[in-house]
Amino acid sequence: LLNLARRDDGIKPEIAEVSPQFFKTTFANYELIASENDRIFDYENRIYRPFMTDQLLLKQLMTILFDNAIKYTEEDGKIEFVVHATDRHLYLTVTDNGIGISAADKKKIFDRFYRVDKARTRQKGGFGLGLSLAKQIVDALRGTISVKDNKPRGTIFEVKIAIQSPSKRKNK
């Protein structure tokens, strides 16, 4: 995380094929981590065919969002992760019923070294790099990331990144 955050030359994606199995494996790992942390983890994996993107960057992005949800959701809290795709875009939605993010903080959470409520993050750990790095990854993958409230409590992160089908990539 720190190595990527230190880079000033930007993140350069290495595009390769990502199989549907990638999500099954990743979500199985997240289930274990959530269980070990006394959180409830649900997911909906609607990826049924391979697509092209940078798998390592995708995994880092997903893990940053998942780790934040774990960190700011209390015991017995719930985290949901939904993935689906069209021919041109991959969509990730991470929802939690944690402590949420204020409107003022939402404007700054993607800034490097910004930490929501310093006292709260000091307890939880972190350098204020995770969501900044998530934004850099999303930008490198030609996408968007947004955050909104999960009423009555919690946060929803929505990500949309550009992808290609394997057949289109091979023809270029």
Residue ranges and their predicted role:
Residues 40-49:
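Conserved catalytic submotifs in the C-terminal HATPase_c
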Residues 8-15, 50-53:
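Conserved micro-motifs of the catalytic ATP-binding
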Residues 69-70:
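Short helix-loop "hinge" at the ATP-lid/N-box region of the Bergerat-fold HATPase_c
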Residues 76-88:
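Short beta-strand/loop element within the Bergerat-fold HATPase_c
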Residues 101-115:
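Short conserved segment of the HATPase_c
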Residues 96:
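Acidic ATP/Mg2+-coordinating residue in the GHKL
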